[in-house]
Amino acid sequence: MPEAAPPVADARGSSPTATTGPGADATLSAVEPFLAHLQIERQVSAHTLDAYRRDLAALIGWASAQGSEDVAQLDSAQLRKFVTAEHRRGLSPKSLQRRLSACRSYYAWLLKHGRIATSPAAALRAPKAPRKLPQVLDADEAVRLVEVPTDAPLGLRDRALLELFYSSGLRLSELCALRWRDLDLDSGLVTVLGKGGKQRLVPVGSHAVAALRAWQRDSGGSAQTHVFPGRAGGAISQRAVQIRIKQLAVRQGMFKHVHPHMLRHSFASHILESSGDLRGVQELLGHSDIATTQIYTHLDFQHLAKVYDAAHPRAKRKKATE
């Protein structure tokens, strides 16, 4: 048996099913050693720890209501019933996935410490959460955003930043980290260090090249300096870019919430719409898995569906007659 855990903040009251059943409060202590492991050894955040506690409290409450006082002894069939009950209670697929993930981690920990012979949660799968389609700017909106006046304070920087964002589809972190040495403006290329330390070469469009040249002349940037420096002299912060893009969108008369990743989404969507080359878009974005890139095919289909609805004679809806 694991040693008793140090006290962990109580979150039992935060789940509707956490205290279901007569023995829920008594058996909640069974997961305290696991929570202590998360807190001390894995050093998870307080937010994550609270989520684990709520999810496991829900399992304990459900098991207690079924007459099972020891959750360590539940089998896969019982866990499947728990997932079904939570789904019927109205829990979203995303929340179910998180709840089942907490159960898997708990049973894996029990297995590692010899409390159980096999994990009843290993093979269980929650319903898939529908992927939310990314919001994008259409081509006209993108042009309106990037063509900010260059005679305003920091106008040259803002123009270069927006042009590069939309031209090359960089992640926010990648753009903030760029130094002038990473740019080959003569060849129209930028070398990007992406997730996992993976390097990729991305084209830079002619409008972005012109804007970057103007900004470099104005700022006196050298090879070692950041393309977009912050006030303290290092790289500009991601938060500063988020705030600035939001401000610029408002100034350009745009009424939707514009954020940095929207420019990356727009880049990917517009390239895919024009080329149809999903693999090429994957490489440009630096996605390790093409499944991540495939979300943009749904956006392209949405566009095609609108074109179809507007143009096809058999798709046009008849106006209701009185």
Curated annotation (Swiss-Prot):
Residues 16-25 have a biased composition (Low complexity). The active site is at 171, 195, 261, 264, 287, 296 (o-(3'-phospho-dna)-tyrosine intermediate). The keyword ATP-binding does not apply. One of its GO terms (biological process) is resolution of DNA recombination intermediates. Residues 132-309 form the Tyr recombinase domain. It comes from the Bacteria. GO terms for molecular function: DNA binding; tyrosine-based site-specific recombinase activity. Residues 25-111 form the Core-binding (CB) domain. It is found in: Cytoplasm. InterPro entries: CB, DNA_brk_join_enz, Integrase-like_cat_sf, Integrase_catalytic, Integrase_recombinase_N, Integrase_SAM-like_N, Recomb_XerC, Tyrosine_recombinase_XerC/XerD. The keyword Protein biosynthesis does not apply. Gene3D superfamilies: 1.10.150.130, Intergrase catalytic core (1.10.443.10). GO terms for cellular component: cytoplasm; Holliday junction resolvase complex. Residues 1-25 are annotated as: Disordered. Site-specific tyrosine recombinase, which acts by catalyzing the cutting and rejoining of the recombining DNA molecules. The XerC-XerD complex is essential to convert dimers of the bacterial chromosome into monomers to permit their segregation at cell division. It also contributes to the segregational stability of plasmids. Forms a cyclic heterotetrameric complex composed of two molecules of XerC and two molecules of XerD. Belongs to the 'phage' integrase family. XerC subfamily. HAMAP family: Recomb_XerC_XerD. This is Tyrosine recombinase XerC. It comes from Xanthomonas campestris pv. campestris (strain ATCC 33913 / DSM 3586 / NCPPB 528 / LMG 568 / P 25).
